[in-house]
Amino acid sequence: MHQPAIMQRALAVVALLAAAAAIAAAQGESPELLPFAVGAAPEGCDVGEGEWVFDEAARPWYAEEECPYIQPDLTCQAHGRPDAAYQRWRWQPRDCSLPSFNATGMLEMLRGKRMLFVGDSLLRGQYTSLLCLLHRGAPGGGGGSRSFETVDSLSIFRAKDYDATIEFYWAPMLAESNSDGAAVPDDRLIRGAPMNKHSSFWKGADVLVFNSYLWWMTGDKIQILRGADEDMSKDIVEMEAAEAYRLVLHQVTRWLEGNVDPKSARVFFVTASPSHAGAGGECYDQTTPVGAADAASYCGSTSRRMVQVAGEVLGASRVPVGVVNVTRMSELRRDAHTQVYREQRWAKPTAEQLAADPRSYADCTHWCLPGVPDAWNELLYWKLFFPARDEAI
């Protein structure tokens, strides 16, 4: 290995440890650390509460065109978005500051490890954001040192010089469902048990990050297939979405308790990403976040009931599940969705249709990259390396 590369990696780890030392100095004696942790977060720091600060000097972390991993439905600049200010907002927690994202340091901490994201297209956006952050902050050494492939439901990024993989597994409802394929069914049907099909891909992950919210929010009841019928059509009962969600999250926690060792692995749940798809496309033509004067009274569309269910079930897990709370911060960012500036995969309007009624074609659910998911990864980075003291083992 070349001497400059060794020095760069050493400095990256030193930077992480220096950040940990600064926090520890203010906190006194440190608790026993969780896997991957290098320090503990300051007491009373809720990184999910704060404000968006315009920071043209430090944001974005990377340019859209320089990241090879972004899907066409998230490349807003390439699809003609006329403004770019949505890329330049930095999340500032109310009572503390986030450490600077250190790409090389993160890869060093993941050396020889497997990090896996499991969930829906919103989590895939966060996964893609992380790959972009690592690509920009820790360029590969050439000679095929990085690779990326997608086979069916699994995407794998390999950082070969670190012997590390960062993966995404598509399971929008976590349990096996009729939403696992490319089609978007009108009704949601999930298998009540077991979780063998999906969870067989999850085993062995050293860092597991999962989410599930969007695909539950149809307004209709969820169909539950009981037993092991292969054609997904027999012995079906219906449940309210929140209770079906509870059922599946209980399955997930049981799987975690039987398959994850909290002394060597970490688990995180990313909270609901809000949609701003109100009547007439609430996000269309928005160019700034919800202002500070309106933020206190602004109430997003996120289902508080679903959030409550997730908190109750995951909070009772015997395997600690770190919560990455992105809901409130994202509710304030109605400006940062892909709107009409994306590849139109499903309903493909003509140019005339789009010009006549752009609001009806606006995607007010997914996020442009670079953008809001980068801030989610800053929170994940914080949680992974600087967990709260009450999360210590």
UniProtKB/Swiss-Prot annotation:
The residue spans the entry assigns to the Cytoplasmic side of the membrane are as follows 1-9
According to the record, glycans are attached at N102, N325
**Catalytic residues of the enzyme:** S121, D363, H366
A GO molecular function term, named singly, is: xylan O-acetyltransferase activity
Q: Which cysteines are joined by disulfide bonds?
A: C45-C96, C67-C132, C76-C368, C283-C364
Q: Which InterPro entries did the record assign?
A: TBL (IPR029962), TBL_C (IPR026057), TBL_N (IPR025846)
- Answer yes or no on keyword Cell wall biogenesis/degradation: no
Q: Which residues cross the membrane?
A: 10-26
Q: Which GO BP annotation is one of this protein's?
A: xylan acetylation
Transferase as UniProt keyword: yes
For the motif GDS motif, what are the positions? 119-121
Membrane topology, as annotated = Single-pass type II membrane protein
What does UniProt give as GO cellular component?
Answer: Golgi apparatus; Golgi membrane
Query: On the Lumenal side, which residues?
Result: 27-393
> Which controlled-vocabulary keywords does the entry list?
Disulfide bond, Glycoprotein, Golgi apparatus, Membrane, Signal-anchor, Transferase, Transmembrane, Transmembrane helix
Main location as per UniProt: Golgi
Q: Identify the tissues in which this protein is expressed.
A: Expressed in roots, leaves and stems.
What is the top-level taxon of the source organism? Eukaryota
Q: What does this protein do?
A: Probable xylan acetyltransferase required for 2-O- and 3-O-monoacetylation of xylosyl residues in xylan. Possesses extremely low activity in vitro.
Q: Which family does it belong to?
A: Belongs to the PC-esterase family. TBL subfamily.
Output this protein's name.
Probable xylan O-acetyltransferase 11
Organism this protein belongs to: Oryza sativa subsp. japonica (Rice)
Gene from which the chain derives: XOAT11
